[in-house]
Curated annotation (Swiss-Prot):
Residues 66-84, 193-217 have a biased composition (Basic and acidic residues). GO terms for cellular component: actin filament bundle; cytoplasm; plasma membrane. This is Myristoylated alanine-rich C-kinase substrate. It comes from Gallus gallus. It comes from the Eukaryota. Belongs to the MARCKS family. A lipid is attached at G2 (N-myristoyl glycine). InterPro entries: MARCKS (IPR002101).
Length: 281
């Protein structure tokens, strides 16, 4: 931003200088020169030519002056830029200065860190120290605790080894048990199949036995029906025989009755020639 302001200021100065230059150059233009060309107003005399040359030289020196002024103006912005850069470098230098103290501080903490280590060594648990009048010796306790922890770790390691050793036979036994269980299950399955086959055979035998029983049971009612029919036929025959016997007995009774009547009729007929017929009783 500082550089931009310096550039704008330099442009303003250059603009302010250029109008002055234009004013300075305007008299030469009023003498008949425009844009570096000489205007001749009809004077072809050598004196006029010499005057024109002088004017040309004077006007020619004016661009040199202008170029010098422009160079001075450009040098001023350059100087301003350099000043701005110097200002920017000056804040950078304090930053560097700040960084350098930081680095120095970073270097100094190493020494300070060394001093706390020394303090820690002073207050380390390895050495006995007094706190409010009581002395605590951590060496023996730490040694005892370390020995106990080492003993516990060793015991744990031994226990782990024993457990691993016991787990290996258990695993082997478990595998053997699994194999035995599989064999037992296979044997049980075989026994179940055999029992099923035996049950099927027994069921077939029972069905075979039940079939003749059913046949005999069916034949028995048929025989009973036949016997009943025979009994009915016999009863009918007996009834018919009884009826015939009764009819025969009636005929026999009627026949003896007719015989006396016939005998009686014959008797009168026989006696009629001999005498009068006796009245019938």
């Amino acid at each position: 931003m500082g550089a931009q302001f310096s550039k704008t200021a330099a442009k303003g100065e250059a603009a302010a200088e250029k109008p002055g230059e234009a004013v300075a150059a305007s008299p030469s233009k009023a003498n008949g020169q425009e844009n570096g060309h000489v205007k001749v107003n009809g004077d072809a005399s050598p004196a006029a030519a010499e005057a024109g040359k002088e004017e040309v030289q004077a006007n020619g020196s004016a661009p040199a002056e202008e170029t010098g002024k422009e160079e001075a103006a450009s040098s001023e912005p350059a100087s301003e830029k350099e000043a701005a850069e110097a200002e920017s470098t000056e804040p950078a230098s304090p930053a560097e200065g700040e960084a350098s103290p930081k680095t120095e501080e970073g270097a100094t903490p190493s020494s300070s860190s060394e001093t706390p280590k020394k303090k820690k060594k002073r207050f380390s648990f390895k050495k006995s120290f007094k706190l409010s009048g009581f002395s605590f010796k951590k060496n023996k306790k730490e040694a005892g605790e370390g020995a106990e922890s080492e003993g516990g770790a060793a015991a744990a390691a031994e226990g782990g080894k024993e457990e691993a050793a016991a787990a290996a036979p258990e695993a082997a036994g478990g595998e053997e048990g699994k194999a035995a269980a599989e064999e037992a299950s296979a044997a049980a399955a075989g026994s179940r199949e055999a029992a099923k086959e035996e049950a099927g055979d027994s069921q077939e035998a029972k069905s075979d036995e039940a079939a003749p029983e059913k046949a005999t049971g069916e034949e028995a009612p048929a025989a009973e029906e036949q016997q009943q029919q025979q009994q009915q036929e016999k009863a009918a025959e007996e009834a018919g025989a009884a009826a015939t016997s009764e009819a025969g007995s009636g005929e026999q009774e009627a026949a003896p009755a007719e015989e006396p009547a016939a005998a009686r009729q014959e008797a009168p007929s026989e006696s009629s020639p001999e005498g009068p017929a006796e009245p019938a009783e």
